[in-house]
A protein has these predicted regions:
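Gly/Ser/Thr-rich loops at beta-strand to alpha-helix junctions
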Residues: 18-23, 80-89, 131-136, 198-203, ...
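Periplasmic-binding protein-like
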Residues: 16, 74-79, 127-130, 190-197
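Short, flexible loop segments at boundaries between secondary-structure elements
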Residues: 159-164, 213, 217-237
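Hydrophobic structural segments
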Residues: 11, 37, 102-123, 179, ...
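Glycine/small-residue-rich loop that forms an oxyanion/phosphate-binding "nest" at active or ligand-binding sites
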Residues: 65-112
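N-terminal glycine-rich anion-binding loop in soluble enzyme alpha/beta folds
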Residues: 1-63, 135-137, 141-171
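A short, acidic, amphipathic alpha-helical segment used as a generic capping/interface helix at domain edges
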Residues: 60-66, 174-186, 191, 198-204
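Conserved beta-alpha
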Residues: 98-162, 245-246
Length: 247
């Protein structure tokens, strides 16, 4: 087959998602990632945005990590901002160290990738557009502060996990733009915007709001793809999806 080399993946990213179903993550991943980068998913079944719910899933997480290792992935990311926020940064970093010890593969999370990306961009003041309740938003802000980023403004819709799982795609897409715009308008000193969460389609908001406000806009996947490529020393800028991936 003449084009076999062009079709063979040059990087396999293992991704452990918090949810039983995976739709919006791969749908958006293959629009943001450079051609030839493969997403290899394994699913948890997170019942709620709490530490107890995350603890319940840890045995399955380790089984998935072993499976992803056998599949030959180059890196494993534990997806889901609520996972990191619920556990706190100290526990997350201990889990990442344990994962690397068990598998010999680099481990990261969406939250750690977001912090790495914001630090790279020089962002210390952040606005957030979120669908989550205030307790979770507070936990996200506390986690980011440990990484040198202060959340100075946020707009939220206060939805539960069950509500977010059933949110229509079109409604979620409109909500992402509305919340992001409102967050930046309410916090003019913010240096960037974060639209966290994997249960909604948000990639369209990146170029739209960056053009409108002249500030970087990040989502889970843009930060994770960027951090993965940079950690591997792979300079593969992606155009059209915001400042971060273009860098």
């Amino acid at each position: 087959m003449d084009n076999m080399d062009n079709l063979e993946p040059w990087y396999r990213l293992g991704f452990i998602t918090p949810h039983q179903f995976v739709d919006n993550v791969p749908y958006q991943f293959y629009r943001l990632a450079p051609p030839g980068m493969m997403l290899v998913t394994a699913n948890l079944d997170l019942a709620d945005y709490t530490e107890e719910a995350v603890d319940h899933e840890l045995p399955l997480l380790w089984r998935h990590a072993a499976t992803l290792m056998k599949r030959g992935v180059d890196r494993i990311v534990i997806g889901g901002v609520p996972v990191g926020a619920a556990l706190g940064r100290e526990r997350v970093q201990a889990i990442l160290a344990e994962g690397e010890k068990r598998t010999g593969i680099p481990f990261s999370t969406d939250m750690e990738n977001i912090i790495s990306a914001l630090n790279y961009l020089g962002v210390t003041k952040l606005a957030i557009g979120s669908r989550w309740h205030e307790g979770l938003n507070d936990a996200v802000a506390a986690y980011l502060k440990l990484g040198g980023v202060e959340v100075i403004g946020r707009k939220t819709s206060g939805r539960s996990l069950a509500e977010n799982e059933t949110l229509k795609t079109s409604d979620g897409m409109r909500l992402a733009v509305d919340l992001g715009r409102s967050a930046l308008e309410a916090a003019p000193d913010a240096e960037a915007l974060l639209l966290p969460g994997g249960l909604w389609v948000t990639i369209h908001a990146i170029p739209l709001l960056e053009a409108e406000f002249g500030k970087p806009v990040l989502i889970n996947l843009s930060a994770t793809i960027w951090a993965t490529l940079h950690a591997a020393g792979l300079g593969k800028p992606v155009q059209g999806w915001g400042r971060l991936l273009a860098s």
